[in-house]
Amino acid sequence: MKYSIEQVMRLVDHSGLKPYLTEKDIARLIEEAKDMGNYAVCIEPIYGKFAKEYLDEKRYKVKLDVTIDFPFGSLATSSRKKIIEDSDYADEVDIVVPMGYVKSHRWDYVDQDLTDVVKIAKDHDLVIKIITEDGYLTQDEKDRLYRSVIRAKPDFIKTSTGFANKDYCASLGNAAGATPDNVSLMSRIAEELGSDIGIKAAGGIHTYREIESIIDAAKRPIDPEKLRIGMSGTGKVFEEMKKIKK
């Protein structure tokens, strides 16, 4: 293996985002993240304060990451800003781009929204990752949106939610989750713009080999401050890597 279990697991935001999860499921998610050495847990904000109290009580070093306007990116900017303000108990937020504006090519609205949400996050000392949901984008839209995101100066640009409509993605010739090609494009555009923005790949990541190809495409240090992998099936990859190691 090119990368060790410890290196890979430290990049992971261990995710539990299904709407039917319970407090017991969230507690289990946190315990799994701690045991596997993951950087963060990524959850819906309904369980944010529960998770914060659980982490504090256990004194775990796992970071708390909550999603905003997820998975659709359909709320007004004012609502998005308010939810970020209300999430100041967290360490990080992952927010979807305003997708309707993106698909309508209202780039003025997109740029203003992204500038506003990044500012609010920074005002509350939150790491912010902006999700492009690139399976919904044409090649021209990817090129334009990636530039908008990078210029807004969030901490990370992120590929996908993991909940994209596969039929719509397929109609554009796209996969519904993270791909090395899109990660590579993010990296190239960031370099062109003189940015060292972090990259987070998420959606449809199930194997070590997929992770390896994404890490190589990102051209980022093996450091959770610059590179993340979001996945719910972390345990399967953990077990797979232990077998490969043997």
From Swiss-Prot:
The active site is at D94 (proton donor/acceptor), K158 (schiff-base intermediate with acetaldehyde), K200 (proton donor/acceptor). Its main location: cytoplasm. Its EC number is 4.1.2.4. It is found in: Cytoplasm. Gene3D superfamilies: Aldolase class I. It is an enzyme of class 4 (lyase). One of its GO terms (biological process) is deoxyribonucleotide catabolic process. CDD domains: DeoC. Keywords: Cytoplasm, Lyase, Schiff base. Pathway: Carbohydrate degradation; 2-deoxy-D-ribose 1-phosphate degradation; D-glyceraldehyde 3-phosphate and acetaldehyde from 2-deoxy-alpha-D-ribose 1-phosphate: step 2/2. GO terms for cellular component: cytoplasm. It catalyses: 2-deoxy-D-ribose 5-phosphate = D-glyceraldehyde 3-phosphate + acetaldehyde. One of its GO terms (molecular function) is deoxyribose-phosphate aldolase activity. Signal peptide: none annotated. Pfam families: DeoC. Belongs to the DeoC/FbaB aldolase family. DeoC type 1 subfamily. Catalyzes a reversible aldol reaction between acetaldehyde and D-glyceraldehyde 3-phosphate to generate 2-deoxy-D-ribose 5-phosphate. PANTHER family: DEOXYRIBOSE-PHOSPHATE ALDOLASE. This is Deoxyribose-phosphate aldolase. It comes from Thermoplasma acidophilum (strain ATCC 25905 / DSM 1728 / JCM 9062 / NBRC 15155 / AMRC-C165). The lineage of its organism: Archaea, Methanobacteriati, Thermoplasmatota, Thermoplasmata, Thermoplasmatales. The gene is deoC.
